[in-house]
A protein has these predicted regions:
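Hydrophobic alpha-helical transmembrane segments of multi-pass membrane transport proteins
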Residues: 37-45, 49, 77, 94-109, ...
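Glycine-/small-residue-enriched transmembrane alpha-helix faces in small-molecule transporters
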Residues: 1-61, 95-98, 102-106, 149, ...
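C-terminal-most transmembrane helix of multi-pass membrane proteins
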Residues: 22-25, 67, 227, 263-325
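Specific alpha-helical transmembrane segments that line the substrate/conduction pathway
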Residues: 61-64, 68, 108-138, 175, ...
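A helix-boundary/kink motif common to multi-pass secondary transporters
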Residues: 58-59, 115, 193-194, 254-255, ...
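Hydrophobic alpha-helical transmembrane segments of multi-pass integral membrane proteins
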Residues: 30-35, 61-76, 140-146, 167-171, ...
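Hydrophobic core positions of alpha-helical segments in small-molecule transporters
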Residues: 38, 65, 96, 122, ...
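Hydrophobic transmembrane alpha-helices of multi-pass small-molecule transport proteins
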Residues: 74, 98, 125, 139-158, ...
Length: 325
């Protein structure tokens, strides 16, 4: 989101719906950038930890249990018991939770078959596509072209190089598709604040994956040391810690700065895979990753500028109507 979105779009959603921002001293811009980078490192490192757990547990078990623990942790942080359930629009929550579950389980399946940076790059096509769909500008063709070029470069053309797993690619693209659905579903009014929407959505996603968790072989092994600690660490690194850091960072970051910086996540994912998992990328794949990052940054900047221009034009139009003279 990118790993489980993760946290980036959830946090923007929560912020847009009136999240209860903690009463903390506003950080400087440099501190805010540092906190956001630390949050992204936490998210992508959680993907690395998940790949380690795949050696001991089925992918579906890791995915389902991680989502369950994350839901519990965020419920405690956001005090889910304060929700007025009479106001909840369950149709929006259900679509949001289904998108979360699909995105989570398909991405974990993807990183089980692909290098972390490659999987994140393919998944990133989902939100990039949504952004480009809603941004009708002349610059859009540049970002679409860069994204397509990046996808092409992801494939190893060297015959001696190890080919990418086609099933893994499909999983990553599927995760990206669910990520796109997740973004659209997150814009639907749920009747409650953004933080509570995230909590209920995660519990819905957990319920969807619960049968998988119950039927998982070797489930009792999860409760043995040190695996229980690993799963808690996975949930904290993927949700609780980045949420907290990004909440503080957003106090002194514009949406443009936030969106541009989070476009670096594919690169951070690749670096995490290289450091912790010794995952090597071809130079063409590294170039592809940077190309997709550039497309995302460019899309973020031009979309934000276009939005600001529209808002300015609307204000001028309203002012002219109010003062016909």
């Amino acid at each position: 989101m990118v790993f489980f979105r993760s946290a980036t779009f959830e946090l923007l959603l929560a912020r847009s719906r009136g999240v209860d921002m903690p009463t903390l001293e506003k950080p400087s811009y440099v501190q805010a950038v540092g906190l956001l980078l630390l949050a992204m490192v936490s998210i992508q490192s959680s993907g690395t930890l998940a790949k380690v757990l795949f050696n001991e547990f089925p992918v579906l078990t890791v995915s389902a249990l991680r989502m369950l623990l994350s839901a519990v942790i965020l419920a405690l942080i956001f005090r889910v018991w304060r929700i007025n359930f009479k106001q909840v629009r369950w149709k929006a929550i259900l679509s949001y939770g289904c998108a979360l579950a699909g995105m989570n389980i398909l991405f974990y399946s993807a990183i089980n078959r692909l290098p972390l940076g490659i999987a994140v790059s393919f998944e990133f096509i989902g939100p990039l596509g949504v952004a480009l769909y809603y941004a009708k500008q002349k610059y859009d063709f540049i970002w679409v072209g860069l994204a397509i070029l990046g996808i092409i470069l992801l494939f190893p053309f060297d015959a001696a190089a190890e080919a990418l797993d086609p099933i893994g690619i499909l999983y990553a693209l599927g995760a990206g598709a669910f990520w796109a659905v997740y973004i659209v579903a997150g814009q639907k009014p749920s009747g409650i604040s953004g933080n509570h929407t995230v909590c209920l959505g995660m519990f819905v996603g957990t319920l969807i994956l619960l049968p998988i968790l119950i039927m998982s072989p070797g489930l009792s092994l999860v409760f043995e040391s040190p695996y229980w600690f690993y799963f808690i660490a996975l949930a904290v690194m993927a949700s609780a810690l980045p949420f907290s850091l990004e909440m503080i960072a957003l106090r002194n970051l514009s949406p443009l700065s936030f969106g541009t910086l989070t476009s670096l996540e594919p690169a951070i994912a690749a670096l995490s895979g290289f450091i912790f998992l010794s995952e090597q990328l071809l130079w063409t794949q590294t170039l592809a990753l940077l190309t997709i990052v550039a497309a995302s940054v460019g899309c973020t900047v031009t979309t934000q500028h276009a939005r600001q221009a529209r808002e300015k034009a609307e204000k001028i139009k309203k002012a002219n109507k109010a003062d016909p003279s």
